[in-house]
Amino acid sequence: MHIRPSEITPEPVWRGRRRLLGAALGSFAGVGLPVSAAGTEVDHPNSLEQISRYNNYYEFSTNKEVIWKLAEEFKPSPWTLTVEGEVDKPRSWAIEDLLKRFAQEDRIYRLRCVEGWSMVIPWRGFPLASLLKECMPNSRAKFVEFVSVSRPQEMIGQRMNTLPWPYTEGLRIDEAMHPLTLLATGLFGAALPSQNGAPLRLAVPWKYGFKSPKAIVRIRLVESAPMTSWMRAAGSEYGFYANVNPEVPHPRWSQRREVRIGELAKRATLPFNGYAEQVASLYGGMDLARNF
């Protein structure tokens, strides 16, 4: 199902709602309520056209500017998400049941690609922790593995060996349970477009974009760190943690500066993509250059 622009809240309407919400939240600043869902200074989101027409989605192509067209025939419904592994209550949900069970929140997050570009995206979704708690992880659940859909008949990039398919990613359990870690179901107040990972993707704003898999069908809680698709393809370049770190360059891209899509000038990249206050304590005592 291709989400037409007319099916997404028009940007002027969406931005008007955000201004009203911001004014309302501002009146509560004295009692400590956050003025943004991310807990950081408010960024202005990129436009819908920028967000939906410049995408890294190797399941379709390595050309970012054609993904939206190639994804038009992708069918995100019906859809089932399964949670299994080291949990006391494994289960599966239809996407419609997930949307009913978990209250949807609007959050504006920064997205930083390891290639040196960035965006600001207004996601809709719910905390991954809410889903995992319902399945009751046991004491052996140390990591969380995410598996994306495999449909080479629709996702023509999967017909090539660009990456090991299906796309697989992982987080530590404490990263997965962090309040910022979002299962995104929407964009600009409406359902996700296929090219942005419909119907369900991860959004982990303090990590590089490849740590946020799209079109997730399976979540598995495991004892050991899962081997991700990028680690299998180029483990010396793509580590398990992938925290945004301006002090640790990628072999092909410096990470000190970034270009926000729609802007000409580069800007300094912030540690943990600007979310250090919320997440740096997760990595206390770790060598972040070694654990990249």
Predicted segments, located by residue:
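Small/flexible residues
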Residues: 6, 17-19, 203, 220
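N-terminal secretory signal peptides
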Residues: 1-16, 27-29
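N-terminal export signals
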Residues: 17-37
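Short, charged low-complexity linear motifs
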Residues: 2-8, 34-47
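Structured, non-membrane catalytic/scaffold regions adjacent to prosthetic-group chemistry
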Residues: 39-292
